[in-house]
Amino acid sequence: MSFFNRTAFAAVAATLFLARPSLAAEWTIDAAHSTVGFSGMQTGSPFSGHFGKFGGTISFDPAHPEAGHALITIDIASAATGDRQRDGAMPGRDWFDVAAFPTATFEATRFVATGGNGYQAIGRLTIHGVSRPETLPFTLEISGDTAHARGHLDLVRSAFNVGQGPWASGQWVALAVGVDVDLSAHKGG
């Protein structure tokens, strides 16, 4: 093959590759039927709460999970546990410091199938200005144009500088925090 033919072939191949449609479908989160919750221990007693405001974009095809991407943003000020004192303290500087860090984000840069309806979202979680690699294992059920994903992630809050001053040690509020994600989404928006 001559230089010209090899160059032409390479150009056509590159054009076809770059012009191919994305393998991942676009999904819109149905916030009314979704929750992002958290749980922990305070003075030996369990507590749980949720974030009332969150959203994001998800591109995912279970046949090609490696082509997926997601960016989820959580409004930290929307955290609620039902305990007036705890809910009043969470937005403050000793905890989430929402004036300086109003949102948390999880950006999944790839997905991995783990068998059956199990997957992992691999990416970066940013809370309180600290960004760390995290993997969220989840299960996925798809029925027509509706998807339902459930996942759980265990975090250490001090790794994200959440809980300062007297709260930093874990003596009063445990360092371990569970995050539960229960998302419904619709294909194509």
What are these regions (language model features)?
Residues L23-G189:
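Low-complexity, acidic/polar, glycine-enriched regions of mature
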Residues S2-F3, F17-P21, G189:
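N-terminal targeting/secretion presequences
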